[in-house]
Regions:
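Structured segments of extracytoplasmic/periplasmic soluble domains
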Residues: 24-27, 31, 81, 85-88, ...
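Amphipathic, non-transmembrane alpha-helical secondary structure
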Residues: 2, 15, 22, 26, ...
Length: 284
């Protein structure tokens, strides 16, 4: 509902379902222990308490600590969205409650999952490192160290490859956009061997696969979260959430080394927004 509102300036879903959104948090509370969401008991839904999904071989996305971390970061992200929704609806007191709840949860995430001796969250995977940064669970004093550790380990442990699955792709992408780490992501996207998008293309892919390796479905709509990077980072187009529907936007291209031009266009409720930039003697 929030993304529909931001992209189309249509508040109907939010107004109709805000009570249900709040009700959903009662469900979350039912399975929260000491402030953190835990895997629910043996029910038919138990197996859907997932962390990352279909990560590359060698990434322990199924480790329980990683699964718990990812799910609690997701709750933090939802609380942030609920705060914005409440403010949009004029519910200031409820917005303050969501903000405080998120603050408390972020502190618990850091206390529970951060390993000071290793400088990592949970297993230290790309997702376990970038998701706490994205939702604000990493203290400011540690942020640069955590970022540096993730980027260094990406090179050392994964040979510079993307190392997330279906869940992690849009999270890593959004983190890279917000942090302006355009070279970090661009270098991963250029890798031609497994795992990566060029590996899919070089092996005959005409759509994204279910697995990075290509087993099972080869038309599965997985890993598509990377698409936003091309128009939000390379194209530089970011929406102004305070003025929804693309009525006001920010255009600030992030240019990785080796790229000299880009063109993009996006349909919006108020017309087509086009960006066309070219570097000449390092001047755009």
């Amino acid at each position: 509902p929030w993304r529909t509102y931001v992209n189309y300036n249509d508040p109907r879903l939010i107004k109709n379902y805000y009570p249900k959104m709040k009700e959903w948090f009662s469900y979350v509370d039912k399975y929260t222990v000491d402030g953190l969401l835990k895997r629910w008991p043996d029910t038919q839904y138990r197996d859907w308490f997932l962390g990352d999904w279909l990560a590359p071989i060698g990434v322990d996305a199924g480790a329980q600590s990683s699964v718990d971390l990812v799910n609690n970061c997701f709750i933090s992200e939802c609380l942030g969205t609920m705060e914005k929704i409440a403010l949009m609806l004029g519910e200031k007191e409820e917005a303050e409650k969501f903000a405080m709840r998120r603050k408390n949860l972020n502190e618990l995430i850091h206390q529970k999952f951060y390993h000071p001796g290793k400088g990592i969250y949970s297993t230290g995977s790309q997702l376990d490192m970038c998701y706490p940064m994205l939702v604000g669970a990493v203290p400011d004093s540690l942020y640069d160290d955590v970022k540096r550790k993730m980027m260094t380990d990406t090179e050392k442990q994964h040979k510079g490859h993307i190392a997330v699955g279906l869940v992690g792709v849009p999270i890593l992408t959004e983190w890279a956009i917000r942090n302006r780490e355009v070279d970090f992501l661009y270098q991963m996207l250029k890798k031609r061997d497994y795992p990566g998008y060029l590996y899919m293309i070089d092996n005959g892919a005409t759509a994204t696969w279910e697995y990075w390796s290509g087993e099972r479905s080869r038309v599965h709509n997985c890993y598509n979260g990377i698409g936003t990077w091309f128009y939000q980072a390379i194209g530089g187009l970011r929406i102004d959430e305070s003025i929804p529907g693309y009525q006001h936007v920010f255009i600030d291209p992030q240019i990785p080394k080796g790229l000299t031009w880009a063109k993009m266009a996006k349909d919006t409720p108020y017309g087509v927004i086009a960006v066309d930039w070219e570097l000449t003697d390092n001047i755009m």
